[in-house]
């Protein structure tokens, strides 16, 4: 089918008319005849979109309507027509998830979720500039739904290498301090308003943390054959197994100290062994060595150089790629992928 070149102002007028009928008149008290005419016109919009599909385009080849049924007006629950897709969004189907199973798998990694108001660029004359959306932040992406009960994300974007920051100037009302924006690597801008300034700051901090976490998993390339051999030798290190051994050792020591008679048995087996009161117990499985130089940009991170011996105090943030370590009396978080076990046990 030959494509149709539709002027941009005509497309804008059509979108405004459809939005006015669908949104502005949805909750108005209309007569039975008026509501019937409204539904007939909306149905005609859907028929035109289905008939011309992606070939119903603007001059220059920019698609004005698609048959996907997802757009800035995707929260209008009217089955008689299919809305258009706005040009300011990244399609989840094309850029992030490819099937329902991938969506379900990603939702198992939810980091933060809640209602936000998303700013629309092409909201038209009658449409609202801000849309309320149920937003979900996972370890890899930012997804948003038409409501909390939505099963399929309407749109979203990958957070890798994105920039999140507070942006108070985008609103002039009392909620200006609750605004923030996210800029993706391809310079797409997504602007949101949270319920409160503290909630907005929390969204920004969580996104920044996840972006930093994705960057920390990238192993820098070094043109050094010796370094390559060192990395090769550490790939098979049983880190998880040694962690379990360390925890088991702690439990065994607790039992050893609490059960009477074990000390006598131990002394009978080894007469030369004498345990001094207050002697600290060293778990060599908690000591790691730096694989590369790591210079921190934040006060909560620990800087170290290759070969430094770091005492790991906690692996609480293991799922995010960070541990809590100590070096020369200084405590901070360290990227776990930059470390290798210091002792062979």
From Swiss-Prot:
Entry keyword annotation includes Cell membrane: yes
> Where are the compositionally biased (Acidic residues) regions?
250-272
Q: Where is the PH domain?
A: 109-212
* UniProt-listed Pfam families: PH, SH3_1
- Kindly provide the PTM information from the record: Phosphorylated on tyrosines.
Q: Where in the cell is it found?
A: Cytoplasm; Nucleus; Cell membrane
The protein's superkingdom reads Eukaryota
Which UniProt key words apply to this protein? Answer: Adaptive immunity, Cell membrane, Cytoplasm, Immunity, Membrane, Nucleus, Phosphoprotein, SH3 domain
Q: Which SMART domains match?
A: PH, SH3
UniProt key word Transferase: no
Any Gene Ontology biological process: adaptive immune response
Describe the subunit structure: Homodimer.
**Full protein name:** Src kinase-associated phosphoprotein 1
Gene (name only):
skap1
């Amino acid at each position: 089918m030959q494509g149709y070149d539709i002027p941009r102002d005509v497309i804008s007028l059509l979108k405004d008319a459809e939005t006015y009928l669908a949104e502005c008149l949805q909750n108005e008290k209309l007569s039975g005849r008026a509501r019937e005419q409204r539904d007939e016109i909306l149905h005609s919009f859907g028929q035109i979109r289905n008939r011309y599909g992606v070939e119903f385009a603007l001059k220059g080849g920019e698609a004005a309507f698609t048959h996907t049924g997802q757009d800035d007006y995707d929260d209008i629950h009217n089955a008689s027509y299919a809305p258009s897709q706005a040009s300011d969004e990244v399609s989840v189907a094309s850029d992030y998830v490819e099937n329902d199973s991938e969506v379900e798998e990603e939702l198992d990694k939810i980091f933060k979720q809640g209602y936000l108001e998303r700013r629309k660029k092409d909201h038209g004359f009658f449409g609202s500039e801000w849309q309320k959306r149920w937003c979900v932040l996972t370890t890899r992406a930012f997804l948003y739904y038409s409501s909390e009960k939505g099963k399929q994300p309407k749109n979203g974007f990958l957070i890798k290498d994105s920039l999140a920051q507070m942006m108070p100037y985008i609103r002039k009302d009392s909620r200006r301090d609750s605004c923030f924006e996210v800029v993706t690597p391809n310079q797409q801008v997504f602007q949101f308003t949270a319920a409160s300034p503290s909630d907005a700051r929390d969204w920004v901090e969580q996104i920044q943390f996840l972006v930093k976490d994705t960057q920390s998993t990238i192993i820098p390339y070094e043109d050094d054959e010796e370094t390559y051999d060192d990395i090769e030798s550490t790939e098979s290190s049983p880190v998880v197994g040694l962690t379990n051994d360390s925890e088991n050792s702690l439990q065994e020591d607790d039992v050893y100290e609490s059960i009477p008679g074990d000390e006598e048995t131990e002394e009978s087996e080894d007469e030369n062994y004498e345990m001094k009161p207050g002697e600290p117990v060293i778990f060599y499985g908690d000591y790691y060595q730096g694989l590369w130089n790591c210079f921190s940009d934040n006060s909560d991170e620990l800087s170290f150089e290759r070969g430094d011996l770091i005492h790991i105090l906690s692996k609480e943030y293991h799922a995010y790629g960070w541990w809590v370590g100590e070096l020369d009396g200084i405590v901070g978080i360290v990227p776990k992928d930059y470390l290798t076990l210091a002792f062979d046990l």
